[in-house]
Amino acid sequence: FLGKKVLKAVGKQAAKKQME
């Protein structure tokens, strides 16, 4: 199960959205 990789990718996108 590659949940960690997905979580990292989602976390990066969420951080980008919060920065704006």
From Swiss-Prot:
Annotated GO CC locations: extracellular region
Tissue: Expressed by the venom gland.
Modification Glutamic acid 1-amide occurs at: E20
Keywords linked to the UniProt accession: Amidation, Oxidation, Secreted, Toxin
InterPro entries membership: Cupiennin
Compartmental location: Secreted
GO MF entries: toxin activity
Protein name listed in UniProt: Short cationic peptide-3a
Provenance organism: Cupiennius salei (American wandering spider)
Organism classification: Eukaryota, Metazoa, Ecdysozoa, Arthropoda, Chelicerata
